[in-house]
Amino acid sequence: MGAHGVKAVFFDLDNTLVDTAAAGRRAIEEVLPLSPPGPAAAVISVLQSKHHYGEGEARVICDKVQAKLLKECHDPAKMCITDLRISHWEEAIQETIGGEVNRNLAAECYFLWKTTRLQHLTLAEDTRGMLTELRKRVRLLLLTNGDKQTQREKIEACACQPYFDAIVVGGEQKEEKPAPSIFHYCCDLLGVQPAECVMVGDSLDTDIQGGLNAGLKATVWLNKAMTTPVDTSPVPHYIISSVLDLPAVLQKMEHKINANLGTDHMASSNE
């Protein structure tokens, strides 16, 4: 793209490039005896034989852990992510079954959930193809919030490193999205200006608001369900239902830029 166009695209990771939510659901199902045998078959067998969980109890535990993950607030200065998430399982089991706290079982559940989730985190072939083609024209950067260990493990699991010029994890920075500082840090990494960058992500509160806060050229909201945001939500420049729609959006932006340049040139020659 031209000097006045897009030089870099920043991508969110979770539920933008990889379906973390689906991987998490699959993993949480495999921890307890609710699904057909898979990578977790051995641990499921132990849970069934040693602890005699019924399906109803297992479902309640799963639901409680899922709710705790959704509301999770992690301060790495106070507790490591591993201890926090083992505590989620510990609390869910305690709240459902009662009796003495079983830290060992909670840890077993957590590590099985974590391992299984990572196994199900994949960068789809068509997404890899899109990134490969885009990188021939613009610089690409992966910008993800979250605990540094957790996010680096996800990045490794989905093997997305070769598709990006740089990768930035919020947990390794002073501030995360939507703070302007992390976006400006990304710009400096790539040697570009905010007005030459586009942010793509599924979160209005972090990806879109952050891109707006940092003065990026454009923000692209991935709205897979095509839901209607509340009136107070930040307004993205573009909305797509699939990340694969992004090249068409970038092409539309380029046409608009070229049209504006043509208009400016005509006005200048008529002066």
Task: Report each predicted region and the residues it spans.
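A metal-dependent, Asp-based hydrolase signature
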Residues: 45, 49, 60-112
